[in-house]
Amino acid sequence: RRQRQMCIRDSSIVGVVILLCILVFRNVDLGIHAPQSLLSLSAIFLILTFGPKAANLLGAFGGLLINFVCIWILMVLGCHNVIYYNHSTLVLGYLLLFGYDASGSAYTMRLFAMLFGFILTGVVFWRNHRKKTYKRGLRDLFNEFNLHSSRSRWQLLMASAVSSVIFIASILNLPRAMWAGIAAMSVLLPFRTDIKKHVCGRIPGNLLGGLIFFLIFPHLPAGLYSVVGIVGGIGVGFSASYGWQAVFNSLGAMMIAVSVIGFPQAVFFRIAQNIFGSLYALCFEKIFHTVTERKLESKI
């Protein structure tokens, strides 16, 4: 029964990642020549499929390198136009697939699901964006990477902060290390003035979400467990502020975690990892920009 639950959970996670990609790329292009966009999209799906698995297989130290490289490539390929906030789909999808690892037949099914997801996303992307013309090609995305560019610094910041916070959480043996990574990813926005505001929304939001879950879970019939995630998803859709999104997001995450690490551990570690990840990202961002700005000034 436990194996069946894990297969259902893995299918749900992969389904969420694919759905997010379809919804995003239905409206957003990659800012390069359409045929080469499909090459970029294929690279993105290859990373989403094999990167998280490789990071899990290689442990904390090997995972640090794999996560950094994969997240950086995702940022360069998919987040060239920062106003689209594509990182909230691509990096989130990567971290979900990393956190909910699969093996054996479950991973084989994941491979087929990701292949299907790529085909479906590619069809939607090509149908909606094939007539758009750009002089920029796939190679230009990497050629334009330059630390004098705020976009490039943000891409490097994201890869560095998220991979390192997961590494620290892993070597400390904290359950659900991906939560710290997701927290860091969520607050590291391309516009620096928004970062502190998101930190101040995410931490109280997870505290309130944890309190709500702690109070209702002991009294919830087992048959209604799946409803919690649905309610959380609906709540996110209707939330007018980032803080309330954090509240409802935490409900579904803790519901899944209960089956893995138990109750009330899921509540404690959800809150702890989000506080850690958010504050780590805030401090890392300040240090990162201080160091890079000094290096850039020294070269002038």
Describe each region flagged by the PLM.
Residues 1, 40-53, 67-76, 114-126, ...:
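Transmembrane alpha-helical segments of multi-pass membrane transport proteins and ion-pumping complexes
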Residues 163-217:
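Transmembrane helical segments that form the transport core of multi-pass membrane transport proteins
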Residues 126-136, 286-299:
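Membrane-interface capping segments at transmembrane-helix boundaries
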Residues 52-143, 147:
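Membrane-interface helix-loop-helix junctions at boundaries between adjacent transmembrane segments
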Residues 142-167:
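Membrane-water interface at loop-to-transmembrane-helix junctions
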Residues 3-8:
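Short, small-residue-biased leader/transition segments that mark boundaries at the very start
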Residues 9-15, 55-66, 101-109, 148-154, ...:
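Hydrophobic alpha-helical transmembrane segments
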Residues 11-29, 44-45, 64-103, 118, ...:
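Pore- and pathway-forming membrane helices of multi-pass small-molecule/ion transporters and channels
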